[in-house]
């Protein structure tokens, strides 16, 4: 999937995977980007992010930095040729004008056995950034799981601020993956991930087949809130594909896919085969209300959620779904600062839609 982030000048940058890189002077697959101004017009030329052009580059993620620049991370499938593993996570910083700042760098620098991928990146209040990723050789790395989630914190200049560390401290059996990271207004960050060993108990009972877990960190990488299960009510079926975003009030919101929606009722009736659910948290990491279903249409499949915070303190959740009278569309639901639905769902089409 492509990744998009807003820029400080009101524009935005889009990053994507190009499967035809060999025709563009690059790899089999490359990572490309394009900046746009505040009116949506192209700003500058399309550019290739990856310097290393052997093998395939995929799974891009982008975050805007406080100085006006941005950082891109991605999966490199030819890591053994680039100083790393079979698969590695690499990164590249850019300044506010879109010019590469320094050389491409290896994010997963210590964990070099097995594969490292599924990167997620977020900018931090102090000017640096944090990257989280999936490590497929967790059993060899700090006595972790089959798969683990790791993270590393960088300063604004790309130097290391906090050495890479395992995010899932307690949940070490089974596999932990699909990480998503977001910055918090106090300078810290939160990581959420998929745990496929739902028998893990957080003190309120065992979970699902797959569960969504989270953990909150201070800016220096120390623990602020111990890991916790996000889906506290829905234990049957599987909960995964998490997305997290920090909120203006210092808290955060997590959205995820629920594969047992037909058995999960939010008071308005049972849901779809797959549903999108969410839950808000306060700055102290405590849940701010119950988990809620984002999709109003409760037939067929709703999945692939993405959540983003808004300047008014609210947030918006978007997802891929099958609605009433259409085959496949992108839906969105906006929420106010209290978590109440603030407007009707938006349905995108294959045309040049505009919202006014």
What do the PLM-derived regions correspond to, one by one?
Residues 1-343:
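Extracellular, repeat-based ectodomains that mediate carbohydrate processing or recognition
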Residues 340-356:
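Acidic, glycine-rich low-complexity segments
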């Amino acid at each position: 999937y492509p990744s998009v982030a807003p820029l400080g000048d009101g524009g935005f940058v889009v990053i994507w995977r190009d499967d035809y890189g060999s025709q563009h002077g690059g790899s089999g697959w490359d990572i490309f980007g394009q900046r746009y101004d505040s009116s949506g017009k192209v700003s500058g030329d399309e550019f290739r992010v990856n310097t290393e052009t052997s093998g395939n580059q995929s799974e891009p993620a982008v975050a805007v930095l406080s100085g006006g620049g941005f950082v891109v991370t991605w999966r490199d499938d030819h890591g053994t040729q680039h100083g790393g593993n079979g698969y590695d996570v690499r990164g590249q910083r850019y300044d506010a004008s879109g010019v590469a700042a320094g050389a491409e760098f290896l994010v997963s620098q210590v964990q070099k056995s097995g594969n490292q991928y599924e990167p997620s990146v977020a900018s931090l209040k102090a000017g640096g950034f944090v990257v989280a990723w999936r490590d497929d050789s967790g059993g060899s790395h700090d006595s972790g799981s089959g798969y683990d989630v790791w993270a590393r914190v960088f300063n604004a200049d790309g130097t290391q601020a906090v050495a890479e560390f395992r995010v899932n401290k307690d949940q070490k059996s089974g596999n932990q993956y699909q990480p998503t990271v977001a910055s918090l207004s106090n300078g810290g960050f939160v990581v959420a991930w998929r745990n496929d060993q739902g028998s893990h108990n957080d003190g309120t009972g065992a979970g699902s087949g797959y569960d969504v877990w989270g953990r909150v960190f201070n800016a220096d990488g120390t623990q602020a809130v111990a890991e916790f299960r996000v889906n506290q009510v829905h234990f049957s079926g599987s909960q995964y594909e998490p997305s997290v975003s920090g909120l203006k009030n210092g808290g955060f919101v997590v959205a995820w896919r629920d594969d047992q929606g037909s058995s999960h009722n939010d008071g308005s009736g049972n849901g779809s085969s797959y549903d999108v659910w969410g839950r808000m948290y306060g700055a102290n990491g405590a849940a701010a209300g119950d988990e809620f279903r984002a999709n109003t249409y409760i037939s067929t499949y709703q999945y692939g959620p993405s959540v983003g915070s808004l300047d008014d303190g609210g947030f918006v959740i978007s997802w891929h779904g099958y609605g009433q009278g259409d085959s496949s569309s992108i839906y969105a639901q906006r929420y106010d600062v209290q978590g109440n639905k603030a407007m009707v769902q938006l349905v995108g089409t294959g045309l040049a839609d505009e919202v006014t």
